[in-house]
Regions:
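Right-handed parallel beta-helix/beta-solenoid
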Residues: 56-61, 74-81, 94-106, 116-127, ...
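Outer-membrane translocation/initiation segment of Type V secreted surface proteins
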Residues: 4-7, 392, 409-584, 657
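Extracellular beta-solenoid/beta-roll
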Residues: 51-52, 70, 74, 280-285, ...
């Protein structure tokens, strides 16, 4: 141990009979000698080999502990304590391991302190870097009434000019509770700030059995207290992560930034007030969260709601998942989010252009109450069980005025959709309703689309499953040139007038996309014998292989006069005979199909669209027998398909389908004459198709349960085919044809959305006219192509084209 001094002689202690011999020994020391551990305007260094002692520093002394260990250190005035790879252990009856006062300075690097670090006001400075502070209950003084890790407090003389500062830089602090009895504000406290400022940064961790950080102004003139937590963690046990006790009028500025974490044992990130606070002390608490995600409540106890303010600001992608209780002002901006986990109340709510307030997560429904609201383009997110007027929903209640503009997003929380009257109340305004709230994205429930309306009578904002119609211009201004006056002698008596305030419910286009997919699924595998045989149904020698490509576009009638459906189908079929019998009259074979459908459902009312997609394939077998006049055919197929529905602004929905489809077909050909070298035949045909489809029950991302209805049943086709047969100059057989078909569908397609059925208005009767030609070459190759148009009930239209190639050997 090295010791130096500039003191001429030690100050003699007061004599006492019991210590007389000790005093005589001290008096005999040479001038300039100092007791080890007691520094007065002196410097000392403690190394690893030096004895473990307690130290006291005054009058600008300096103590350096480099790799060594000491007991209690007390430093005052302008003294400096440097700890480097050192250890300080509380001993004896001392409450703390290190006690600083006046303008003393403590700098610790990579050191361990067993016991509290106490700062007794003044302009003291503490910097703990990469160090450890541990307050272990087992090592506390018997009968101790406090356990605090780092304590910036006031015990002695106070001056309003004093601003002690504490920096925890990459430092770990752990504080236990007293075994008995634990106290609310003096035991298990990670850090206490009564005066001055504290920075907890660079990965520091403060773990406390009670409160993580406690701020309490002890004096009327304590000034502003500042706590900054940057890239660090503050964890509490039985108390709040941060507690403010407003004993006297003070300002508290608290910032949590740069990915910091607050882990609140009692669920409160920040609590202002509670036991021990002094009634009547006006307090301003400013809580800023900057680029950090926190989970817990921010609370101003009701006793202080009228005697202080708690102001919360979220900035720079910050997020709080929790409640705001009695918050005076909340500002949400800078891509920040407040996700409410329960009912909350705020005095002045300001929502910036990139801020979001989510009133809940859909598990429960919450109410946010604000005295005033100012919107600057941010977003309010509501969870609503979309149904009728009585639907459960998150709600914003503004007791005073609402100004500015904000967007509203609505997520369906399992609502089945229903017709509304006045609507589902989202926003209630008690004062001047000057704010504009715009629905962002879409609100859908069941088969219905919802829209946001401002009610003219109360200024509130409601969701309605209806679309406001444009007013009649002649009602607005009867003097317009196009407005003819009604003859008062012969007035028009309108029948079943439509209430313009409450029009009918609006269907969402996704409902049409589901129906279009169902229609396509039923049609994708349908075919007849001539589709496989390249247009021929007569007996022929040899084994035949074939391939066919076709494409069809269908336009279905409007669903409920709102949704217009277009379905484009295409497929590739391949097959080959595997057996031929009865001199070529009979044959059996196998086939495969790859098919897809793309559908569009468009709402003329809203302008929204949805797209449907069906993709898949099938394997099947067939068998037929034919003569030059009669043919009979049977086939069976098993298919599996993947379905998708994608609506504007909504998540993509996926579900699967499978089906069995079987067919029986027969026809008989009559010779009716000849034109030149071309023989004419007329052939009536009859086909029965049975479809057994199974589509998964699907739950959408918004909670709507979608189920197929009536997608299995028997359908039929009756046709009449006029065909000519002749030969070209090259010797090929050319057979032009014209076919008229009548299709009758037995199944009534439909889908249920949360058990509310909706039919696609697919026509039961369709009428087709198809024309084409088949060419048989001498080489055994044949080819055919055709084009057809179809009309059906309710304005259904369809066009189809096909190309087939077959080869026999």
């Amino acid at each position: 141990m090295k010791l130096s001094s500039v003191v001429s002689s030690p100050r003699p202690p007061t004599p006492h009979r019991l210590f007389r011999s000790l005093l005589l020994a001290l008096a005999s020391l040479p001038a300039g000698a100092v007791l080890a551990g007691d520094l007065d305007d002196q410097t000392a260094e403690v190394g690893a080999a030096d004895p473990i002692e307690a130290w006291s520093l005054i009058n600008g002394s300096q103590l350096t502990v480099n790799g060594g260990q000491t007991q209690h250190i007390r430093a005052g005035d302008t003294s400096v304590v440097n700890l480097q790879n050192a250890r300080v252990v509380r001993t004896g009856l001392e409450r703390e391991a290190i006690y600083l006062y006046g303008e003393a300075t403590l700098v610790a690097n990579s050191s361990r302190i067993d016991g509290s670090v106490f700062i007794d006001s003044g302009n003291t400075s503490v910097t703990l870097k990469d160090s450890i502070v541990v307050v272990d209950a087992a090592q506390l003084v018997p009968g101790a009434n406090s356990s605090i890790g780092v304590d910036a407090s006031i015990l002695s003389t106070w001056d309003s000019q004093f601003t002690p500062s504490v920096v925890l830089d990459g430092t770990y602090v752990r504080v236990d509770d007293l075994h008995s009895p634990p106290r609310p504000f003096t035991t298990g406290i990670g850090a206490r700030l009564v005066v001055g400022q504290m920075d907890i940064l660079n990965g520091s961790q403060v773990v406390a059995a009670n409160v993580g950080a406690l701020l309490m102004g002890e004096r009327v003139d304590s000034g502003a207290l500042r706590l900054d937590i940057n890239d660090s963690t503050l964890q509490s046990g039985r108390g709040a992560a941060i507690q403010v006790i407003p004993r006297f009028a003070s300002t508290y500025n608290i910032t949590v930034a740069n990915g910091s974490h607050l882990i609140a044992g009692d669920g409160n990130l920040l609590r202002v007030g509670r036991d021990g606070a002094v009634s009547g002390s006006f307090t301003d608490v400013n809580f800023t969260v900057d680029d950090a995600r926190l989970s817990g409540d921010v609370r101003l106890d009701s006793l202080f709601a009228t005697m202080g303010s708690l102001n919360v600001a979220l900035r720079n992608k910050a997020q709080i998942d929790g409640r705001f209780i009695n918050v005076t002002r909340a500002e949400i901006d800078g891509d920040s989010n407040w996700l409410m986990t329960g009912d909350s109340n705020v005095g002045r709510l300001s929502l910036g252009s990139t801020g979001t307030v989510a009133l809940g997560n859909g598990s429960t429904f919450n109410t946010l109450t604000a005295d005033t609201f100012t919107g600057n383009g941010g977003t309010l997110l509501f969870n609503t069980m979309l149904g009728d007027d009585s639907s459960l929903t998150d709600k914003l209640v503004i007791n005073g005025d609402a100004n500015g503009q904000a967007n509203v997003r609505v997520l369906n929380a399992g609502g089945a959709g229903a017709k509304t009257d006045k609507g589902i109340e989202l926003i209630r305004v008690g004062g001047a309703s000057n704010a504009q709230f715009d629905l962002q994205g879409r609100a859908v429930g069941g088969q219905y689309e919802y829209f946001l309306f401002k009610d003219a009578s109360d200024g509130g904002w409601y969701l309605r499953s209806a679309l406001a119609g444009a007013p009649d211009p002649c009602v607005v201004d009867p003097t317009l040139p196009e407005c003819r006056p009604i003859d008062p002698v012969d007035p028009v008596n309108p029948i079943d007038p439509i209430d313009p305030i409450n029009p009918g419910p609006v269907l969402r286009p996704e409902a049409g996309a589901y129906l279009a997919n169902q229609f396509a699924l039923d049609q994708l595998l349908r075919h007849g014998l001539r589709d496989r045989q390249g247009g021929s149904a007569t007996a022929a020698d040899g084994v035949r292989g074939w391939t066919r490509v076709d494409a069809t576009q269908s336009r279905l009638s409007a669903v409920e006069d709102q949704l217009y459906l277009r379905v484009d189908r295409s497929r590739l079929q391949l097959g080959a005979d595997v057996g031929v019998f009865d001199n070529g009259r009979g044959r059996v074979g196998v086939m495969g199909t790859v098919a897809q459908s793309s559908a569009t459902s468009h709402s003329e009312l809203t302008g929204y669209s949805a797209r449907g997609k069906v993709e898949g394939g099938a394997l099947g077998v067939y068998g037929n027998w034919s003569t030059d006049a009669l043919y009979m055919d049977a086939s069976a197929q098993r298919g599996q398909f993947r379905n998708r529905v994608q609506g504007d602004g909504l998540a993509e929905e996926r579900y699967d389908s499978d089906l069995w489809q079987s067919s029986l077909e027969a026809g008989y050909r009559f010779n009716i004459g000849q034109i030149g070298s071309t023989a004419l035949t007329l052939q009536p045909e009859l086909q029965l198709v049975y479809t057994d489809a199974n589509t998964d029950v699907h739950s959408e991302a918004n909670g709507t349960v979608v189920r197929a209805l009536g997608d299995s049943g028997l359908s039929g086709r009756a046709g009449l085919r006029l065909q000519g047969e002749g030969r070209s100059a090259a010797g090929a057989s050319v057979s032009p044809y014209v076919v008229a078909n009548w299709y009758r569908d037995g199944a009534s397609n439909g889908m249920a959305f949360d058990e509310e059925a909706l039919n696609a208005s697919v026509p039961r009767n369709r009428y087709e006219l198809n024309a084409g030609a088949r060419v048989d070459f001498r080489t055994g190759l044949s080819a055919s192509s055709g084009f057809g148009v179809m009309r059906g009930d309710h304005g259904c239209r369809e066009a189809t084209a096909n190309v087939s190639v077959a080869y026999k050997w």
